[in-house]
Amino acid sequence: MSYCSGVAISADEGITMRNGRAKALQEHSPDQVATPLLPQVPPQEQQDLNPQQQQQQQQQQQATPQKQAMSADEKKATKKSLVIVAGIFVASLVTMCYVYAIFPELNASEKQHLKIPRDIQDAKMLAKVLDRYKDMYYFEVMFGVVVAYVFLQTFAIPGSLFLSILLGFLYKFPIALFLICFCSALGATLCYTLSNLVGRRLIRHFWPKKTSEWSKHVEEYRDSLFNYMLFLRMTPILPNWFINLASPVIGVPLHIFALGTFCGVAPPSVIAIQAGKTLQKMTSSSEAFSWTSMGILMACACASLLPGLLKNKFKHKKEA
């Protein structure tokens, strides 16, 4: 009896102990057991951390421009700008026709060559025609070439290289160099204006992220923009039509753009003028640029960057 009772008592105690351990395990989850091993963060700091992260995310989203639909006013302004550009283009064509009308009387064989040259053969034939009338109609011939040059530059139409070679053939070096620099600067400035009128709104609408990145670079190197404009005009890294269209969109000032263009096109123009002196012997426009001339151009381009690089270096040292 006592033996059975002892056994019963032991069994009850064992059951009680097992139930107690099971209850303890249920009350303490694995996460709660492992929690003391990890660094404790006060609840108040955890509550403050989430709003900060949300604020940072909102700032990042606001800093990155997103493509948005154009408003009704923006669409109306864009259409109006396109109409103005179309009107300017038509007016330019009328001016070209006027130049053709005031030109001296040509025979049938000469009239077919009076056009904007598309290759070196066209440039040769046009040079022969203009050279024949240049002495008697000096300013008429010059005005016609200048108008054609500015027209090509304004509307980003290829062909200005052949006109540069043509000017080198027709006129003495100082006159030809000034005319090329003047026409390039004037035409590029007009293209800049047209892009500012229409392109700025469209480019920022379709490529907001790229536009924002380029604008930041321009702002970062604003003190050296003239040097960078010289470099771009001297080298074929970016086509001139792209520089003309993109500059107003990313915030390049007009006076720096125009002056940088006038001075920057001078070194390549010297090569084109020298090629014009041997125009009738050329078989391709690529003959105008030899490895030697390209090396000289690159040296001039690198030299134009040097003042800007030194200025930025001293600026960063001063800020540090």
UniProtKB/Swiss-Prot annotation:
In embryos, strongly expressed in the nervous system. Residues 43-68 have a biased composition (Low complexity). InterPro entries: TM41A/B (IPR045014), VTT_dom (IPR032816). This is Transmembrane protein 41 homolog. GO terms for biological process: autophagosome assembly; nervous system development; positive regulation of synaptic transmission, cholinergic. It comes from the Eukaryota. The chain crosses the membrane at residues 83-103, 141-161, 173-195, 225-242, 245-265, 289-309. The lineage of its organism: Eukaryota, Metazoa, Ecdysozoa, Arthropoda, Hexapoda. It is found in: Membrane. It comes from Drosophila melanogaster (Fruit fly). GO terms for cellular component: endoplasmic reticulum membrane.
